[in-house]
Amino acid sequence: MSGVSYLQSLETIDPDTVTQKLRQMRLEKLQAERAAREQALLDDIDTVWQEFSDAVILGDSRAVGFSYYSFLDASRVLASSGERIDAIDGHIEDLKKLDPAYIFLCYGINDLGWYGSAQDYADTLLEKIRLLRRELPEAVIVVSSILPAYEPAVSREKLWLQIPDYTAAVQAMCEENGVLFADNTQLSEDYADLWQPDGIHLLPEFYPHWAANLIFASWGEIADA
């Protein structure tokens, strides 16, 4: 059936039903376009770094890898070993100078144990996000879920087992406050072999996949048309 014929056939249907069908058609079209856009990036994943030309990554030692392995310039990666979200305040002036369009927050592994609960951590992270929004109101903020730890790390430190709880609390906080969230759960399972032997840090081959997931999150959710 042609597009014109299809629309003519809708004339005999209840207007609310027509509206719903048209919205569904538009949503499916947008979803297909998004899927094609994502696949195009995955098919040529080394081009993902072009997407970070106006972005800054904040985070801990795992985020350091973005610059350590020369994927991104060090000026665009404000991260250091052992860093926690309480360090965000100290990056404000550098962020203002860089004036990025996107800020990716890649923290968490060092924050475990510093807060009374996963909810306390999520609440504190929200305070930092509000600070960033006040100081850099034009920037889009994306929160990366905490990447997991694997053996032998989890045998040495049981705190790592709390990562799923922290992820759930942060994701809920982001959804409630309109903050973009990059869920790395499935990605980390798919590429679990790309962790360093210590079970915490990452091999360089993981970074393009993580970067792509961050970029996908930065595009936002597809609104119900």
Residue ranges with predicted function:
Residues 106, 144-145:
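Alpha/beta-hydrolase-fold catalytic nucleophile elbow
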Residues 149-225:
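Catalytic His-Asp segment of secreted/periplasmic serine-dependent ester chemistry enzymes
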Residues 128-132, 174:
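Hydrophobic positions in alpha-helices of CheY-like receiver
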